[in-house]
Amino acid sequence: MESLLAAGAGGIGVAAAAAVVAATLAVVPPKDRGNNPPPAVPGLPVIGNMHQLKEKKPHHTFTKWSKTYGPIYTIKTGASSVVVLNSTEVAKEAMIEKFSSISTKKLPKALSVISRKNMVSISDYGDFYKMAKRNIMLAILGFNAQKHFCDTRERMVSNVLSSLHKLVAVDPHSPLNFREVYTTELFGLSLIQNLGEDVCSVYVEEFGREISKEEIFHVLVHEILSCVVEPDWRDYFPYLSWLPNKSFETIVSSTEFRRDAVMNALIKRQKERIARGEARISYIDFLLEAKNSTQLTDHQLMLLLAESIAAAVDTVLVTTEWAMYELAKNPDKQEWLYREIREVCGGKAVTEEDLPRLPYLDAVLHETLRLHSPVPVLPTRFVHDDTTLAGYDVPAGTQVMINVFGCHMDEEAWESPGEWSPERFLGEGFKLADRYKTLAFGAGRRTCAGSQQAVSIACVAIARFVQELQWTLREGDGDKEDTMQYTALKLHPLHVHLKPRGS
């Protein structure tokens, strides 16, 4: 599974943000820019600022521009105007106060086809979104569902630790690949929550063969991520949309076909297990009930299930891997966390019930989400009514893009923002409101539905990993902080030396 992640990883939620540059769909330019438009970044005729974003890490470029043009400015991508927001204050104004004017998402062609706008993270706010979110909250992400799956989540962490201990016992002196072990178990947890079992293999009729769990992951996660960032130049120049783009269309249709084939095979398998009374209650049961009451079509059911399977992996993987990297890089902070765990839990394994009594663990999580936000840039939204942001006129027809990375690097909001310092969330200078200055899970009505589960899994995992093992970076890895293109996934998987505590 490591080979898959080396090329790309993450669920539809991260995939949507990974497509953020492509998501600046060209629309009819605003007729009237108003009397007080945001500052504009100089660009070239026709293409605007597209040539300045070719490094595929737009969040870094946006943040650099904010030093010159301020927390809000306008760029051009082809025929479209995009207002980029780089401060938490202005971002929350857009997401909460002005939500009614800029709630519609604009998607690139690839993401639009792959999602058909029938996914929770992609659909616009309306009846379908509310129905779909209600079902996933009841099945997986709500309070009662979280209690139901608590033992499953904690068993997943125990399985990761068991695998790590075995690898250390076999070769105690060589660094091991943390991501490979962790992702396998995370994907297994996702399959249990969504389908009722950790699927080892499934027969896919369209392929004419049985495929392994690793290939299921490849089709449902890696291929989808690779597809949605596939550029289609017609997104930027809508007046040329009548021209064919055969290579793009072939990639998208092939990816959609393979995804649908695997998902339909998994759904068929689970329907058979449900009929035999073998399956535990999971997300698919709630979706089937919604389908039977005519709220969902078969295709919508399949898309919602595919989204949830992939989404359960991305945020937790990114956050946990970065947290363990920072703790291994900063042994003094690792020991601080270890001492806190010993004082609170003694020799007992950390559980979700212990989390409220572990303030430094909470600080480690929030600081990791701030510095390494799983979604560096939120998907573009469309302004459908004239509005204002930070006192500037933003006319209908404009698009709004929130640079989460830039918000978290804002020197007016954070002291030494480039440093990983959990202590900023502790002590006399810390205010509870500081936690909400991070935008890792969005804000307002579209706050990420899976935030509580992501926090619970990541916190228990981080605590248990530090509680049982001493973490040291592989030699030479102390400066490997680069990310994979549009995402926050570490470009280089975390390789660490582990030493069991007390040995």
Swiss-Prot record:
It is an enzyme of class 1 (oxidoreductase). It is a single-pass membrane protein. Belongs to the cytochrome P450 family. The chain crosses the membrane at residues 8-28. Its cofactor is heme. SUPFAM superfamilies: Cytochrome P450 (SSF48264). This is Ent-kaurene oxidase-like 5. InterPro entries: Cyt_P450, Cyt_P450_CS, Cyt_P450_E_grp-I, Cyt_P450_sf, KO_chloroplastic. The gene is CYP701A9. Expressed in roots. Its EC number is 1.14.13.-. It comes from Oryza sativa subsp. japonica. GO terms for molecular function: ent-kaurene oxidase activity; heme binding; iron ion binding; oxidoreductase activity, acting on paired donors, with incorporation or reduction of molecular oxygen, NAD(P)H as one donor, and incorporation of one atom of oxygen. CDD domains: CYP77_89. May hydroxylate diterpenes. GO terms for biological process: ent-kaurene oxidation to kaurenoic acid; gibberellin biosynthetic process. One of its GO terms (cellular component) is chloroplast outer membrane. Induction: By UV irradiation.
